[in-house]
Amino acid sequence: MANPDPVMVAYGMPSAPLTEILTPTTPTLGDQKAPVLIVEFSDFTCGYCGRFYRETLPALKAEYLNAGKVWFAYRDYPRDEKGWGLVAAHAARCAGEQGQFWEMHDRLFDQHARLGTGIIIKLAKDLKLNEKKFAACMDSEKHVPAIMADRELATTTLGFLGTPGFLVVRTDGHRFADALMIPGAVPFETFQKEIDRLLKKR
């Protein structure tokens, strides 16, 4: 979902435990002691999510994550209850069992327009995953409930209507406050403005 003129909502959301927006297994990047957290809700088959991955996330890493000012979390929002978005989300989690969630995340977005069984198997081989364990994990579909719980949080609790969606919050590592929802694909400058606003509240 493109959103060049984003509508910001949820300023002043009450302080709440971080566990309301993260789980113990939510993949994250950056220093978890950083004062600002961005939670992305995304679909590996979404073109606008791929744009964020290619254009905006690298700038956020360079400007904020590498400086210890922001940390980043990825949660699943497959747009359909079945299909390659769900399969890809499961593949990333299965790779995560072998310590390579982010490596699979990157490759899935690099190949998002070509996703299929053959591509996912090739990506697992390229990452030198234990193929037997990866295949067993994929066949089990054991991560589907957690993936759909992410989707439920994005749609029902937070009210996102498409992908990607972002929750930007100030945090002390245990609780969050001053939450801001950014629906849709927005440029780095939009994140920069809101991150800097939150950093000034430290």
Walk through the language-model features, giving the residues of each.
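Short coil-to-helix leader/linker segments, especially the first N-terminal amphipathic alpha-helix
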Residues: 4-23
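Generic secondary-structure boundary/loop-capping signal
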Residues: 15-18, 25-26, 74, 105-106, ...
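Short, well-ordered amphipathic alpha-helices
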Residues: 23, 57-60, 167-168
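Short clusters of hydrophobic/aromatic residues that line enzyme substrate/ligand-binding pockets
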Residues: 28-29, 115, 182
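Structural alpha/beta surface segment adjacent to cysteine/selenocysteine redox centers
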Residues: 34, 39-125, 130, 161, ...
